[in-house]
Regions:
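Single transmembrane alpha-helix segments in multi-pass membrane proteins
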Residues: 4-91, 252-263, 352-353, 357
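Short, non-helical or kinked segments that cap or interrupt transmembrane helices
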Residues: 24-43, 80-93, 189-192, 212-213, ...
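Short loop segments and helix-boundary regions at transmembrane helix junctions
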Residues: 27-32, 71-143, 183-185, 241-244, ...
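Small-residue faces within membrane-embedded alpha-helices
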Residues: 9, 13-20, 37, 41, ...
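Cytosolic-side transmembrane-helix boundaries in multi-pass membrane proteins
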Residues: 137, 177, 195-209, 278-373
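Transmembrane helix-bundle core of multi-pass membrane transporters
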Residues: 98-182, 237-242, 279, 283, ...
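Helix-loop-helix "hairpin" substructures at the membrane interface of multi-pass membrane proteins
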Residues: 56, 158-237, 260-265
């Protein structure tokens, strides 16, 4: 929980969280968006292009959002207008997004000073904000290594020093999404389209319009996540920059049970595990094994006592023992496996959370106007 690790975790959680918010908007309207990864890819390229073209990182933010929206528009045409299977359309978006940005890089970045077929020139830097009056006191407390208190000081330092304005914008989008989707008539109608579209249609709701709006917003958010990677996380566009974060964002949606708060928690968890493996390698990831073992024990007890599922509890308990044995007999995790930590965490969390999930009732279900007749 050092300040550096927390700061890195925050930066790694933002693109996952933005992609997850995009998936949340789309799926709450009943459209599965597997194409988040492709929309993020478009956001990384268009974000870099916009920042270079207009010499402003904020122009890159807008361009990244537009790039993601373009990918979302294709997805909406296919799924909402023409009724194409959502999974097929999303996979196509992912494939097309990668190929299209590679072509654009050869066309635009190749030949620029510092650019090439796989990367852009360095991009204009995004501004940061710090609460300077807190830095020295928190640094002092963190250096004392007091139990809990120093860890808390490290967390506070990580989230109050050198935070980009883009990060603050991304964080604010979480409560804003909650307010729009759960506290406004627009959000109520949109969620109705994902739960009971036929009933919504019978009440005069234009289901097509709301599904289109949700998918476009989904693309905008995913594009913002991609733009964050190129503008803030790296300061440069690189081919393959997203690294599967669109898929992890979709996993964060599922982990959060299709709610913004849970989604933010999932993004923070995945970002933190990613930061551990990047900053401190196998030793820190090894320490996570004990946490995982204790978590599995708690799940086993819950399955046995509350759910009366003896077989499932036995399997979970055996896995917990196996994880603890690995922790006890080793001192570190081989470097070859540390890079897989975020993805392994994703799989583990989803397997544990799957028992309490409730997706929107009409998520992924084809809808045609007039079905109620």
């Amino acid at each position: 929980t050092s300040a550096g690790t927390v700061s890195a975790a925050l930066g790694l959680a933002v693109p996952i969280g933005l992609a997850g918010l995009g998936g949340l908007w789309s799926e709450r309207a009943g459209v599965v968006n597997i194409g988040l990864e492709g929309m993020m890819v478009l956001g990384t390229w268009f974000g870099a292009w916009g920042a270079l073209q207009f010499h402003s990182p904020w122009a890159g933010v807008v361009a990244g959002a537009v790039g993601g929206a373009l990918g979302a528009a294709i997805h909406a045409v296919a799924t909402v207008t023409f009724g194409v299977d959502h999974i097929i359309s999303g996979v196509a978006i992912n494939i097309v997004g990668v190929g299209f940005t590679q072509y654009l890089s050869q066309l635009v970045f190749d030949g620029m000073p510092g650019g090439g077929t796989k990367n852009s020139p360095p991009l204009p830097k995004m501004g940061t904000v710090s609460l300077g009056f807190l830095d020295d006191p928190l640094r002092t407390v963190e250096a004392k290594h007091w139990f809990v208190l120093s860890d808390f000081a490290g967390v506070l330092r990580g989230i109050t020093q050198g935070v980009s304005w883009f990060t603050i914008l991304a964080i604010l989008l979480v409560p804003l999404s909650f307010y729009v989707l759960w506290r406004t008539p627009f959000g109520l109608r949109l969620r109705a389209c994902g739960e009971r579209p036929v009933a919504a249609e019978s009440l005069g709701v234009n289901v097509y319009l709301y599904k289109w709006a949700a998918v476009i917003v989904s693309g905008v958010l995913a594009g913002l996540g991609g733009a964050f990677l190129s503008l803030v996380a790296a300061g440069i566009y690189r081919d393959g920059q997203t690294g599967g974060r669109g898929y992890i964002g979709l996993a964060a949606v599922i982990f959060g049970n299709w709610r913004p708060g849970g989604l933010a928690g999932g993004a923070a968890l995945f970002g933190y595990t990613d930061a551990l493996q990047l900053r401190q390698g196998g030793i820190s990831v090894h320490a996570l094994l004990l946490v995982v073992a204790l978590l599995l024990v708690a799940v086993a007890v819950y399955q046995l006592v509350r759910q009366r599922r003896g077989g499932a509890a036995l399997i979970t308990g055996v896995v917990a023992i196996a994880v603890f044995v690995v922790f006890a007999v080793t001192d570190t995790v081989p470097e070859q496996f540390t890079s897989f930590t975020p993805h392994l965490t994703t799989l583990l969390v989803l397997s544990l959370a799957s028992q309490r999930l409730r997706m929107p009732a009409a998520d992924g279900v084809p809808y045609r106007r007039g079905q109620a007749k």
